[in-house]
Amino acid sequence: MKNTSALAETAALWAAVRFTADGLVPVIAQQHDSGEVLMMAWMNREALEETLVTGKACYWSRSRGRLWRKGESSGQTQKVLALRLDCDGDTILLLVDQTGVACHTGRRSCFFNEVGPTGEITVVSAPLVTPEALYGAEGHSHP
């Protein structure tokens, strides 16, 4: 990622990104070297600008109603190596270098519940670290 404010002001980018009516766009974070899908989150324009300028993933927390700088409380950061738009401009793919785990449950990926053919759900990966170790004794609520 280029760390320039000029990039965040690129008119072509703002014309290409199709935000929802409430000003958000879904974002998928994927580990750049393995292709592992780590998580899904949301960005508003401010979060996207900050991500472009800093090269670090910044999202919009719908539950908290504020910017969520990935790793600000856990230390589990995402360095953004590339940002891609899908064909419709309504979803962003971040290729990241994930430090530690991506999920607030302590798992590498948020996608650890596998749904079987009859609808049963099986947990396919165990936590690598406890939420308490990441966020302290008070734990962590969903971003």
UniProtKB/Swiss-Prot annotation:
Sequence positions that bind Zn(2+): C87, C103, C110
Reaction catalysed by this enzyme: 1-(5-phospho-beta-D-ribosyl)-5'-AMP + H2O = 1-(5-phospho-beta-D-ribosyl)-5-[(5-phospho-beta-D-ribosylamino)methylideneamino]imidazole-4-carboxamide
Residues annotated as binding Mg(2+): D86, D88, D90
Keyword Methyltransferase recorded: no
Cofactor(s) the protein needs: Mg(2+); Zn(2+)
The enzyme's E.C. designation: 3.5.4.19
Coiled-coil spans in chain: none
Domain of life from the UniProt record: Bacteria
Localization per record: Cytoplasm
Entry protein name: Phosphoribosyl-AMP cyclohydrolase
Higher taxonomy: Bacteria, Pseudomonadati, Pseudomonadota, Alphaproteobacteria, Rhodospirillales
